[in-house]
Amino acid sequence: MLGKAKEAFDLEGNITNEGTINFLEQCLDNFIQYVGVVSKLKRPKPIEPEDLDCNKPIATTVTEVDHDDPEWVEKVAEITGAVSGDTYVKLDHGILTVNQIDMFLKAMPFELTYADDNNQFLYYNNAHQDPDTMLAKHVPSQSGSRMSTVHGSLPPARMKNVEWVIGTLRNGNQEYVRTIVPGSPEGVINTHNYQAVYYDDGSYAGINEIVFNFKPWLDWYLETTGQRPCRRKRSFCTGCN
């Protein structure tokens, strides 16, 4: 095919020979099946029930303040002497002030949250004046709360989903868990990405959640590349009808 590239592709870069297309699709299908078989060789660890009530304090847990105290941030900041404002913080490869870190995180095109390995909800990048404009609604009083409190309005079946996500990442059964929230309004693909955070020794240190509307990213990609979704499975095409 490479020796006859002019005949093999049309002016828009699409393969013209249907037999070649079918052959390549079969190769992709076989590869995907192979990956599926190999993945099953590594059996996932069984998921134990998660303690969403923060009953197992870790080294960084502040026990003097109740986790669900709506003024948890202010009280813990006073107890720990937490720095703020223009105080410099040495990071992994850089030095920023606390204000710069705040600005940097708020400028991210995502809603970010972090809960530690004791299932305590410690942080979200509070970039929205109105929580109702968030894809995953959070309010300042939730910082520090137990995960059972943060998700307290969920029915039991969905709380089991929360436990499954945390347990899956804690066990290393998956590198990440991604989901699209159904029932979103037109123009919104409400995407949630849950990623494990690890200590230097490789042990589980908590979970980082990224929430964003994937639709503008998808639209930008298609417009920039001149592609559009094709009817063929797992495919994007140039000039495809």
Outline where the language-model segments fall.
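Glycine-rich phosphate/pyrophosphate-binding loop and the adjoining helix
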Residues: 1-56
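Generic detection of long, well-ordered alpha-helical segments
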Residues: 21, 25, 91, 156-159
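A general structural signal for well-ordered secondary-structure junctions
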Residues: 41, 111, 172-175
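Juxtadomain coupling helices with adjacent low-complexity linkers
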Residues: 55-87, 94-95, 101-105, 211-241
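Sensory modules in modular signal-transduction proteins
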Residues: 86-128
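Sensory/regulatory domains in signal-transduction proteins
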Residues: 116-123, 127-223
